[in-house]
Each structure stands twice: as C-alpha cells, then as structure tokens.
C-alpha cells in the first residue's frame, strides 16, 4: 500500500554483524551550577556513577541506489521483501511489550510493477525490527506490517505515518494520525498478515455541528493507558507562530455520520487544552501590585507536549525557560499540576522519554556541542527576554535538516553540579560511521524498552544543502549499508536487570489545570504583558526593571528592556547590567531579532566576575525562519564563563 507523505512542519540491507561498542561516560562540561530537577521532595543524592553501555546498529531493509521502479531486484534482496533508498525516510518508534521488537516506518522504493508479488513493497510502511539479533520466520530481521494491505482495509486518507508508538496490547500502533490494528493478533505473530491489518484515521472535531475534516494535529503521543492521546496544534497569535497542546480520549467510531472521512475511525472526545488563559503564567503581573512581575517557570506551561511518564501520572513537555535562552523539558502531574524540571543543562533539548520505573530520563540534547551556549551559558538570568526569543532560539538548534542532538541518560534528580548525564554513544574514535561519529545526529524520539534494559534511538547524517557547496561543512560520505543516511541504534544497559513497569494510574478525562475544549470554540489568544515598566524582585536579593513595549496594534510585545541591579535568585551570584530585545515578524514563521546585551554575573562572596554576556557595540541581529532553521546573524553575542568563551555558530552552519 502506498502512503503519501503529508507536508509537515519539521521542529520536520542484509543482516549485518552487530556493531558493538562499550560506552564510557561523557559528562558535558557545565559552565555553572545546574539546578536539580524540582519537585522531588527529597534530599538530592550524589550523581550516579557511569554505567556500562553497549551500542548496536540494527538492520534495516536493503538499499537500492535508484528510486526507479524495478530497481529493487533479487540481487538487492534475494527474498523479494523490498528495498529502501539511501534516504529511507526512517522514523524509529518504541518497543513492543516483549522488548524484542521495535516499531518503525520506512519509505520503500524501487519495487517492480504490479502484479509482481514484490510490488507491495512501496511507499511509507510500518515495519517491526528485531532488537535481539534474531529473525522473523522468513529470515529477515524486519517484518513489514502494512505492505500489501487491501485497499478496503485502509479507506481513510493516506496520511504520513511518523512517530510510530505501539500500544500496550502489542496489537496496535499509533503512527502519525493513524491507528494500525491487527485485530486479535499480535503484530509480531506469524498470524498477523497484511490481510488482517486495518488502518483507522484519527479525527479531532473542531466544529459545533461535527462537520468537516477536523482540526490539524501533530506530534501525537500515546498515553500508557492506551486510551488517551496527547497532541499539539499550531496556530497564530498576534501575527506570531503559536502552539497549544491537548489531551483527549480515543473513541472508536465504526460508522460515523458526520465529519470526514466517513470511514471507520477513532474520534478524539473529551478533549482538554493544556493551557488556561486565566491561570498564572510563567511571567505575570503580581495581582497584589500591578507594578511588579512574578516569574515562575514551575506553573504548568506546555509549549509542546512530548509524552507521558510510564505510570501515566505526568505529561512531559517543552516548557517556558526557567533560565534565559535555556530551553528544557519538564513534567507536570496531570491531576495536581505539580511541575518538575527534568533537564537544566544550558543547551537545547526536546525529545524525551521517562524510564519504566520512573527513575531515569533519556533525552536527545545538544549538550556537549556548545551549539547554543553563546546564548544560554550564563546561568541564573530569569526568562524575561524569552517572551520574544523562544521560537527563534528553538529554530537555531538545527542547521536546516542537520541536527546536533546526541542521546543522554540522566537520573531522576536531573543535572546538578558537574553532573550532566551520561552520553549513551560516547565510546568510539569518532571516525566516519563509528558509534560516536559526530556527523550522525540524533532524531526524535529515544525510547525505553518496557523492561528498562534497552534504549532505541535513530540518527541521520548531514546531507546537502546543509553541508557542502557554500556551506563550510564538507558533506560526509556514508559508510552505512548501501550508503544510506539514516540508521537505527540500540543502547544496551548491560548492568541492569529487567524491571517491572510501574502500574498505570487511571487518569481523568478532565485535566484540572487545563480547560475542556468545546468543538467550535475560538482558540484563545495567549495573554501578554501590557505596555509599561515593571519591577521583578530577585528571590534572594536585588531586582530587575522590565520595560515592555507593545506593537502598534497592541496585539503582541515588540520590545523588552531589562536592567538588572544586584539581582539574585540563588544567593550565590548577582547579575548586573542591561539587556534589550526587539522582535519583528513579517510572517508568523519569520523572526528578526535585534538584541543588545551587557550582563555581568558576580560571585557574592568574593566579588569575582563569574560570567559575562555581551553583544558587539552594534548589537546582535538574528534572522531565522522556523522550519527552515538556517542561522543568519550580523553582529556578535558572546558569553564567557570562568574564562571559557562561547561564540555563535558561523552563518549557514
């Protein structure tokens, strides 16, 4: 069955000998004290010792060098079970409940024309990949679940099948806006054949009368109760790109009478928006004194939903920066709204998965690369200018399709002191194709096995135009089978015994700190500070004077200017100086930022200058488009911490 790719906003062989590497610890150098994860309610223990990790590359279908019909021959694949291209369109997902199989989607290509039996291996398809070195009965280390589905078994729209996630019953997979179902059969069983597989679309009703195709949903994440679904939906507020996250119940509708498509489908019902415009926001006016601001990143502020804890109690998300220019992931209790900060490294993170026992976090993070440290390495600066810069900083994490992510394992207490987690794929010599080759970059999402002994992740290689040509980074030559530019990896946590997953806690259809969504209701405008001058008091000492200027239509903030005077939240360091930022958007996706900074962070006890954050005299001017993610700037912004200088990346890199 051919599944066409739907346009998305990016944020986007034969069995080979397993590649093994013993991973040693890799602790990112932290330029300053990193706060532990909040909300533990317990004394924070010392960081864990490095543990032994072996990383293997898992097999995928063989590669055909051409995408022409018929180019996948028995010479490429003697079993006639299909080929993928050098750019295989890989999306790695989670494990089936047996911890032996990983769900993934790939783009098959080069199939012969029908009625050849191998003609079914074409287009985007769901596959299972053996994670334990064994094979399926036909001798392949993978099984295509959807290849050859009769058209009547998938009557809905052919939407992209990204971010595949297996249900706990082992019989169903969420892939894109579809649920792939093998009825009473487990997907890995021989009895689960394409003739028994059904694909059902998911629809979110957004009209009062139930008409139309429903709302646009993205970044879907399955709740571990197999009943609820988290998702995000983009919008525009005040001419700027915005996004809200939601949680709803999946309800099978075998015979819909309203809305499209009019085919058996899953409807999202009892939906809650994880944003309440009437609740306290991370940066808000003090209700007892309208001239003062309150800054609290530990109120629920879901920027983009990223998943759930294994027991289902918490939702994970990219949150409002707890420190200026430092984008982290958080977890909020779905009932109480209590928030934990999962990461605190100055670099960028968003892909995240919590371990089955709830004691560990795995992330894809730019830590160790210094990609964004020129913005964020000075610690303890409250996220005030982030009212304008969050989207642009998020876009700067990539260079086009080139990512800078690597997988890190962090304990539940988070980054602290010099501890910044353990890199899963640290071992190796960094040579082309090695486990720790820096040009193989992580993608979303890393996933734990249900028994807690493995972590699956996938990577892509930098390719033109994000290298080569005018780009100063030469394009690497792939050493992967067939020269493909994506690979599926598994990290074996060899010293860990199999775990028992935490029981899933029943959750309500209503999130108390969210707002029930009424189909047809207007999308709320995200509130913003009104024009004026405010004072933000440091938690320990000092203050910051914050001047907010709105745009000409008073629909959004255009400029934020901050003057710090002996400002301190931790009682160890004070911040002095000024920072001013202006944002212009000629389209919702295009950000032009004018940034002037002259900040100094000083040790209270000794008076020693610990860090500075300064722009060149003419300022730092960033021009970047969300989705394109090409870094272009004039002027400089430089952060220095204890003599360590962090410079911005070169334009186009």
Show the residue positions of the predicted features.
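Secretory targeting and sorting signals
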Residues: 2-34
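Sequence signature of WD/YWTD-type beta-propeller architectures
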Residues: 38-653
